[in-house]
């Protein structure tokens, strides 16, 4: 009764009735298999699938928001703008003090004071030179005028003397005729001849004096030109020295205080430093956004294996990090421009959402600009605008193939790996 076989037999005994159902007909199984195989073949032959890739990016505007950095090290001593203020290109933003101090005071102030004193002395020297030039040239001009008057008077006297000598010469010739006719004696003729030659000698003396006056006029004119040129050269040398001092004064200002100016028109979005704060070279000072933003754009970074399949006008799906897809869904955008050269590292560093290349795994990235169709997102009776720098993820739709082609793609790889050298 307690044998093992009896116990096993008791366990295997059925407790109820067995109902045998009729089997599925063969023709139904065949029909179902044919329908399934036909549908599967139609699906893989007719159906298509687009390869897609997810890339990162961020929202921006054109022109972009401008970050102004400090080019010097110093202390902020004055702030000219406030957040939200509209500014124009060239407007002052910050005043930074970069001067150094010693026991004798501020170095730049002392240097500036010395240069200003030198400039005052140089200006005084130039003024005295100009005054001396005027006095010297006026004196020489007066002498020239005096000699000119003397030359004119002596010329008039010589002209009248020449006329008188001509008359005396005629009288002498008449006396010769009178003496030949016996009307006068020889002594009278001799007196007349002596008087004529005496007047001739006087004329020669007047001519010599007249020539001396003309020569003196020429000498004075030459002195006027020489003295003027000499004074001009000396004044020019002093002006050059003043110009060098002025340049040195400008350099002193550069070493004392630096004014940071706006580089573009726009609105001050944020100020990074306050008065009294120390800044180093490369520190961010403020951000300026465009005054009127017409459109927001999406900057996408696409790897090199995807960029050949993208063209302007393609649609892409966008998911904003600020607007989760679980709540807001995906948004549509249109590709506007595609760069055909890889973006440089310096350019990518200016975008916070750009991918970072790791050492040993450098990937060429191409910049693609897309325009979202919705610039403002409506949610719960509110309008939520896009903002600069918002991170986003986009799905790009690349090449489109039949499903069977995607299924056979591993065999294409095997074919390429087994192919020998190509002979073009």
Curated annotation (Swiss-Prot):
Gene3D superfamilies: 2.40.50.100
Keyword Thylakoid: no
One Pfam family, short name: HlyD_3
Keywords: Bacteriocin transport, Cell inner membrane, Cell membrane, Membrane, Protein transport, Transmembrane, Transmembrane helix, Transport
Stretches that traverse the bilayer: 26-46
Cytoplasmic side: 1-25
Membrane topology: Single-pass membrane protein
Subcellular localization: Cell inner membrane
Domain of life: Bacteria
Segments on the Periplasmic side according to the record's topology features: 47-424
PROSITE patterns hit by this protein: HLYD_FAMILY
Cleaved signal peptide residues: none
Any single Gene Ontology cellular-component annotation: plasma membrane
GO process annotations (BP): bacteriocin transport; protein secretion; transmembrane transport
Family listed: Belongs to the membrane fusion protein (MFP) (TC 8.A.1) family.
Function: Probably involved, in conjunction with MchF, in the secretion of microcin H47.
Protein name: Microcin H47 secretion protein MchE
Originating organism: Escherichia coli
Name of the coding gene: mchE
């Amino acid at each position: 009764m307690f044998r093992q076989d009896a116990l096993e037999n008791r366990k295997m005994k059925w407790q109820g009735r067995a109902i045998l159902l009729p089997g599925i007909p063969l023709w139904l199984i065949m029909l179902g298999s044919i329908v399934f195989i036909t549908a599967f073949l139609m699906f893989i032959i007719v159906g298509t699938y687009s390869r897609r890739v997810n890339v990162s990016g961020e929202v921006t505007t054109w022109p972009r928001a401008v970050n102004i950095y400090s080019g010097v090290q110093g202390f902020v001593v004055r702030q000219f703008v406030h957040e939200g203020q509209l500014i124009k290109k060239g407007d002052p933003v910050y005043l930074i003090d970069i001067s150094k101090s010693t026991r004798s005071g501020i170095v730049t102030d002392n240097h500036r004071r010395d240069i200003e004193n030198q400039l005052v002395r140089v200006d005084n020297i130039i003024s005295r030179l100009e005054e001396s030039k005027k006095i010297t040239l006026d004196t020489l001009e007066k002498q020239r005028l005096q000699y000119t008057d003397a030359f004119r008077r002596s010329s008039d006297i010589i002209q009248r003397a020449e006329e008188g000598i001509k008359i005396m010469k005629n009288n002498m010739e008449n006396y010769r005729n009178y003496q030949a006719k016996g009307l006068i004696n020889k002594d009278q003729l001799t007196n007349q001849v002596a008087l004529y030659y005496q007047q001739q000698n006087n004329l020669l003396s007047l001519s010599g004096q007249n020539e001396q006056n003309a020569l003196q006029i020429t000498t004075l004119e030459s002195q006027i030109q020489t003295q003027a040129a000499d004074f001009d050269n000396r004044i020019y040398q002093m002006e050059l020295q003043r110009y060098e001092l002025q340049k040195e004064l400008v350099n002193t200002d550069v070493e004392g205080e630096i004014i940071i100016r706006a580089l573009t028109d726009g609105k001050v979005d944020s100020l990074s430093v306050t008065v009294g704060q120390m800044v180093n070279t490369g520190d961010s000072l403020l951000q300026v956004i465009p005054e009127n933003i017409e459109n927001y754009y999406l900057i996408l970074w696409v790897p090199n294996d995807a960029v050949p399949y993208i063209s302007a006008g393609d649609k892409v799906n966008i998911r904003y990090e600020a607007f989760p897809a679980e709540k807001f869904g995906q948004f549509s955008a249109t590709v506007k421009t595609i760069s055909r050269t890889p973006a440089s590292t310096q350019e990518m560093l200016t975008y916070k959402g750009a991918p970072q290349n790791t050492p040993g795994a450098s990937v060429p990235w191409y910049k693609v600009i897309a325009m979202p169709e919705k610039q403002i997102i409506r949610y719960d009776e509110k309008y939520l605008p896009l903002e600069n720098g918002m991170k986003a993820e986009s799905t790009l739709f690349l090449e489109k193939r039949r499903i069977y082609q995607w299924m056979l793609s591993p065999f294409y790889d095997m074919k390429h790996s087994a192919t020998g050298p190509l002979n073009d």
